Amino acid sequence: MKYEYVETFGSAVQKHSERLVVSEPSGEGGQRTKRQVPALHLDHLLIGSRGVSISSDALELCCERGIPVTIVDRRGKPVGKFTAPAIHGTSRTRRAQIRAYENGLGVTFARSVVIGKAANQAINLKYFAKNRRERSPDQYETLRKSAEAIDRVARRAKKISANCIDEVRQPLMVLEAEASRIYWSSLSALYGSSSGFVHREQRGTKNPVNAALNYAYGVLTGEVWTACLLAGLEPYAGFLHADRPGRLSFVLDLIEEFRPVVADRVVFALAAKGWRIEQEENGWLSLASKNKLLASLAERLDSPEPDRGRRRKLRNVIQRQAYAAAQHFLGNETYVPYKQRW
């Protein structure tokens, strides 16, 4: 998977034949560096700064080649997306998704999201524990017990049912929060001394691991957003996450089972290898750290994983789950969350 990330103020993205040409300021005297990116080899264009321009010809090329263009803020959070109209699917799926809010299918989906996220959090802890069984039995036992506790939370979620999501959103969110508390507490105990990761922080964090997690979640949000559009789903009509103006509620629903699988795995694997996360004064990741993280996320998304009897790249698993959600709302199949192997 190939990301092209453009952040430097004053940069420009233009088209030349079947290539994107990225021109960036380089030092004094008005000098610029240029690099050419074949559209054939590009999966996603990320623009991460104010002061970056892109030509209409470049946008047209991206549309023709199915390359989403996502504008992200300095934390990696998507603030806008440019895609071709042809990828947005049919209105039939969107209508079914809206009806699912009050016909029980929305409850089934939201419950599956909570179960899937908890299962993958537990699997992550088992994954991190397996290499510690001999060299650190205390850590191994702590992680094993935490994973079992999260699995118990997932089993409790299976018992929740109703016809309208409004009736069960709060109980589901409470269980999701309980599983996450166990998960992050365990990871803090595991990595806190080496990375300063004490607890999960979102906005305004100065902690390097949290800053990396936030950025990774932002990139993953862009991937899931695109998958939702391709499946004909409405990104703003969520179930577990309540509607709010401008909030990608359904994208936030679907992303939950993939946070541990993609973002957490990558960030903590890098931390375990001694990655020195560079930050700017405001806590944002440096450009070098963003590029390192993007490369690792792309590698993870391209890794083949077992899924329903075959091996698929993780980014294809995400797309498969978006299609499965669409079929669920249409009444053709029951949504089953993706659970990673360890």
Model-derived segments and their meaning:
Residues 1-25, 64, 88-342:
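Active-site helix-to-loop segments that bind/position phosphate- or nucleotide-bearing substrates
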Residues 46-48, 67-73:
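Short hydrophobic alpha-helical runs that function as membrane-insertion/retention elements
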Residues 21-40:
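Active-site-flanking structural segment that lines cofactor/substrate pockets
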Residues 37-53:
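Extracellular/luminal Protease-associated
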Residues 75-81:
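Short gly/pro/ser/thr-enriched loop/turn and capping motifs at secondary-structure boundaries
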Residues 18-20, 27, 51-53, 76:
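Short, glycine-/Ser/Thr-/acidic-enriched flexible segments
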Residues 57-61:
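A short acidic, amphipathic alpha-helical/loop segment
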Residues 85:
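Core catalytic machinery and nucleic-acid-binding channels of phosphodiester-processing enzymes
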